[in-house]
Amino acid sequence: MLKRRRVAVLSPVAWRTPPRQYGAWETVASNVAEGLTARGWDVTLFATGDSVTRATLHAVVPRGYEEDRSVDPKVAEYLHISEAFEHAAEFDLIHSHYDFMALTYSRLVRTPVLTTIHGFSSPQIMPVYEKYRDGYFVSISDSDRAPGLRYMGTVYNGIDLSLYPLRAHGGGALVFLGRIHPDKGTHLAIAVAQQSGRPLLIAGIIQDSEYFREQVEPHLNAQIRYVGPVDVAGKNALFAEALALLHLNTIPERFGLVLVEANAAGVPVIAMDLGSCREVIADGETGFLVRDVADAVEAVARVGEIVDRVCRERVERLFSVETMVAGYERAYQAVFDAEDLR
């Protein structure tokens, strides 16, 4: 039986944990900390000072640098990460959700570090992973793995299902929910809406202003609307109006938390068949996997085949906080076992 021990959960400091609106990594770190705490672990969450948690909160950065532009990102990150590692001896495990930066501290402490890789943001960061390839890693999908790293398993991201209730009924609008960026294919969602004759609601932060001005804003009208960033309540309001969620990435998806959130509410997802989408969406059951805009337009005509309850039941089975935390407990045990053999 796994012994509950002392765990430090290291969350990013771009946004509050959990985030008010955007912030997938912070969302997952929060769900891990809350889920572990509920299962009896002694958890300390390293996050911004305005974060909300039932675990012990340890903070040296008052607010996220994306929310308070007076906070210098590099200064905040180095103070935050170094603070966690200076307290490493107080924990049996550090669970990092911090990409490659925290890895550079991992050999300076005796406490084992497990890193959840939320995505390889660019080829330029790979030398860090290559140097620390003998560390402990978890992937968030089988598709998003790098060769040569020591993986303790794949643990799918889990959501708090109470935040995304099954909707009473759907609407007739297509919904895009994510960063306004070429990688997320906002322009493709617009094309699908135009060709299918359906209204489109676009929600999310504008991460690429030039892209928004050139490929999104000129198409905004009564049919295609940009509603800005949304919080959980805003997402649920969109899901209530949704015929389907369009997730037409132009690059391989690492996981796609919004796919799970939409399915939890009973919303079918039309997703580009790239990266993890095949793991998250059951083609023909919880949505449709497509190759291009033409495929997506055909899928819009078929969304009536998808049953809301089936979508939610799959999320309950595979993508709940409880399922995720159980997966991390197995990964923690694998780390502890490996450490015992050293």
Give the positions of each predicted feature.
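Catalytic cores of nucleotide-sugar-dependent glycosyltransferases that transfer UDP/GDP/TDP-activated
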Residues: 1-342
